[in-house]
Amino acid sequence: MEVKWTEEQREAITTRGKNVLVAAAAGSGKTAVLVERIINIVTDPEKPVDIDRLLVVTFTNAAASEMRERIAERLISLLDQHPEDKRLADQLTLLNKATITTIHSFCLDVVRKHFFLLDLDPSFRVGDDTETLLLKLEAMEELFEELYEKNDEGFLLLVESYGGTKGDQYLQDVLLKLYGFIRSLPWPEKWLNNVLEAFEVKEDFSFEDSKWAEVILDSIKVEILGLLNGMSVAIEKLREERGLEGYLSLFQSEAHHLKELIDSKSWNEFKKKIEAISFERLPKASKEADAEVKEEVRKLREDVKKRIREIRDKFFIDEEEEIKREIKKLYPVMKALADLILMFDKKYGEKKKEKGVIDFEDIEHFALKILSNEEVVSYYREKFEEIFIDEYQDSSLIQEAILSLIARDNPPNRFMVGDVKQSIYRFRQANPYIFFEKYTSYSQEGENKKILLYKNFRSRKEIIDAVNYIFEKIMSKNIGEVDYSEEEKLNYGANYESNPFEKENERTVEVHLIEREREEEFEEDEEILDDMQVEAHVVGERIKGLFREGFKVYDKEIGGYRPVEYRDICVLLRATEKWAYAFEEEFVKMGIPVFADTNAGYFDTAEIKTMLSLLQVIDNPMQDIPLLAVLRSPIFSFTEEELVDIRLEDADGTIYEALKKASLREDELGEKVRNFLDSLKRWQEKSIYMPVDEFLWYLYEETGFYSYVGAMPQGVERQANLRVLFERAKEYEETSFKGLFNFVNFINRLRTTSTDMGSAKTVGENENVVRVMSIHKSKGLEFPIVIVAGLGKQFNTKDLNEKILYHHFLGIGPEFVDYRRRLSYPSIVKEAIKYKIKLESLSEEMRVLYVALTRAKEKLILVASVKDIKERAKKWGKAKLLGKKISEYDVLKSRSYIDWIGSALIRHRDLKLLREFAEISPELEQDSSKWEVKIWNKRDVIIERKKDEGIEVLERLNALNLEGLHTEFRKEVEERLNYVYPYDRSSKLPAKLSVTEIKRILNDEVIDEETTSIFERRVLKTPLFLEKKRGLTPAERGIAMHLVMQKLDLSKDLSYRGIKEQIKDMVKNEILTEEQAKEVDANKIERFFKTPLGKRLLKAKEVRREVPFHIKISSREIYRDLPEVYQEEFIAVQGIIDCFFEEEGELVLIDYKTDYVENGKIEEIRDKYRVQIDLYGKALEEITGKKVKEKYIYLFFNDTIIKY
């Protein structure tokens, strides 16, 4: 059947004699177009080209194999139609030697053919990752040792500045990462020299004209535009309010100043304008003004003032000469870093030469060097009539340099296919700017032609509409690196037959939001695991729902619809580490067949942890943690009590020394210890002469551990994991490195550098299973049903906090370190690079989301865990819409995919529920996309999950045949199974609670099902040399105020000046930090002591402050719905009383609060803290035996006294 090509596809197939850039959107049939163009060229009736004179470069080996197969299929098909055509037969024969390959394979071929142009042994081999990493580590260790011996001044400066607290590990990691980065560049040494030259700051250098200033200024302008948008919203509100006319004119004037900042053309112009900005005092509002609106706009203005002040203080305090001096001061340490990189490159090169190996990066660099030879490059230019580059958006700078060298200029002969919106490999040094530069410079005419393929033949209209709706809102040239305009939008091109049995809205895109419990922190590993499991359960339930609903998918092979199968479903995750394992485990429990395609989690499996600990102990038994892991493992099965007894044998030494002493005991434990030590000695002796792989398998058999894990749940997979470790040991033995010590070091290095090996798989991905994979691995694939989960996970910005940042265009940005004063702060160069990397990282995240959403053919489901949905919805509702797009400022502020999606969707007509949460009524957008949102409560999911587990157990029990059992015995079994423990609630009651937790429980009138934390949070003092100018959080300000109120000498002068002097003394004595002292308002404290309550406190004979207490109260006083039987169940309560004083034999209690309090909310505050104050009063009477006659809260925010 003849393919019906679109006009744009046909143009891409037939255009000749030009450089052609095909911007091919997801699902647009780019591979089919590429294949057809190749067939068209080799069968051209006028100017045919043999297929072995074409260079076809693909991104992966799999893509190259697929391309070769598809070309072969087309040639065979044509040959069937024209069996007499000798040329077609010849092309089929030539296909075997056609250059259809990855860029690395092509470069390796160039190197093998022209090795004589390099100082390279012709018998060289490409080392695998294991061997080359070991060579790098060996070279680095030797280099560092040599430089220490020489007392190399530059190197020692580097060590002092960036060595870190754990030896040289941090500096070594920086070296490896930076070395890897610069080797992705065409001319790394030249790049390093240019970077170094920038830090020399020559006479003609102008920071204002530098690329660093340009980046910082652009980033600041985006932020100020966001502030201006906020001011605009406030101005609109003020226009509608009476009594705030003075506010309106002032806000308009200040908004004008912000606009002037944005319009600044240069750094110095911006500096002058921001220095000139001053915020006048707000005029008095009339009584008829709405208090809520007044407070809202006042707070917004305060935020603007604060941020403008921060920008000014951070970037525009220093004059040009001071900035130049700072950059120049960085030159010595940058020179030392550049020298270290070059020395390492030389040392590593020598190591490789000794072993006769080259590494992966060498392949491209050697090819580039060879192709710089005019004779060689002319050969390749002559050989290849046309160069095809697939996935062009993922090209690196060095790959672009290589392909540019062999391309022709007359006539141009490059055919490049890609989609910048799918460029997601920046971490592999892919540079989307290469594609984007051509995308903006190529046109429909001329020698450089651009062709757009935006008709999507993969997805249903519901998915196309949904993707367009989201990305037209959030993707822009600045964030995403392409403007999602009408030109970029996906156009529906698929031809799905109608399904007469389809239910209404069955294909609607679903958004499932799981509300996390309050006060949960997403960054804590245990709680992340909870979120992962809950999300996995929700996804599992939805998968089961698809089967229950009889969901059908279109099958091209049968030409109609069929019921959904597990293989039709794919769950996509941004990061599979931990997440994929949680999903796999949950699906197995739910009876859903699953294949998790992940390279992470291997080192976290119990069997691998145990075996690696054993290897570490055999290598060096003086390591307590691995040794304890081995002793507690099933191999030796020491109990906790036995380990305590062993430790008591030598409380101060290592565990190994304690074991040796315990071996002298004449009891059962002594015998057990002696058996362990004998085994250890035997294994140490064998490890000396046995190859690591053979020794490892010997351990598996000797310990019985391999058989043991096979009997555990998922035993087949666990044994497969042990075999993977054995295979890795075998590979290691094939390198030039030997011995257990080196192997253990190598594995440890893999773990610390996050280079996981991927757990073994016992289920194939082609079976009828749900696939769980990373979004990156899904690129180029398609699935009938796609579920994108983990969308609430925060973007990973960890790399931005590194001491040294680097960028191909902006160079290297170090932290400024004064190691003598133990002072460090980001240099202005680092700030510029940090801004740029953040922008590029967010752009990449946006493209990753685009790839995920465009994998779906028939059904798209999005899942996210969200903390406090109402608050998050309010945040989404505040995102400013400029035309059809959300402001770049709001897009930049977003911390997760769901923030982007939520901000885009909240104005959609289908998302009424979110608008109700946000308490907004915006003008609705009438878009053709269809959405459905469902809210899940995490607690309900956990309860449901436990019910499912219980039902599963009951079903298994019911399946047992009990008929043959003796009647009495059967009756006893049933009674035991049906027994309900009468004091079940006791098991859920905490042993201890803080007053804050009790206040929350009583205010909510809810019993937590899970144990509550018994520890109050404490803020630890930051070392002075690590303090940063970030400002204190409200909680930290409150702690600082309480600290001052506790430490003030009440007998001294308590005027404003006297209090300030005492605060200064507290800083000197290191009770307070400088930052805390600045945040404590002495005026507020002075005003307290002038109140009647404050005066009474000062007159009192006895005043006690910050008094901790522990009391015991009945559980029924806290959990009011408990039955009477719990009256004697007690809970320990702990807390700290701010202050009390004695007056006429009775006590007066005061609790200070630094909370922000809205006008008219005093009664709410009174109710909020009633439980807490009552408990403090009860505790005080118990511990003193005296009556508490009065209880007060003092609000520092508005100098208010609340009496109870």
Curated annotation (Swiss-Prot):
This is ATP-dependent helicase/nuclease subunit A. It comes from Caldanaerobacter subterraneus subsp. tengcongensis (strain DSM 15242 / JCM 11007 / NBRC 100824 / MB4). It catalyses: Couples ATP hydrolysis with the unwinding of duplex DNA by translocating in the 3'-5' direction; ATP + H2O = ADP + phosphate + H(+). Heterodimer of AddA and AddB/RexB. InterPro entries: AddA, DNA_helicase_UvrD-like_C, DNA_helicase_UvrD/REP, P-loop_NTPase, PDDEXK-like_dom_sf, PDDEXK_AddAB-type, Restrct_endonuc-II-like, UvrD-like_ATP-bd. Its EC number is 3.1.-.-, 5.6.2.4. GO terms for biological process: double-strand break repair via homologous recombination. PANTHER family: ATP-DEPENDENT HELICASE_NUCLEASE SUBUNIT A, UVRD / RECB / PCRA DNA HELICASE FAMILY MEMBER. ATP binds at residues 24-31. Its cofactor is Mg(2+). Belongs to the helicase family. AddA subfamily. Residues 3-460 form the UvrD-like helicase ATP-binding domain. GO terms for molecular function: 3'-5' DNA helicase activity; 3'-5' exonuclease activity; ATP binding; ATP hydrolysis activity; double-stranded DNA binding. Residues 492-780 form the UvrD-like helicase C-terminal domain.
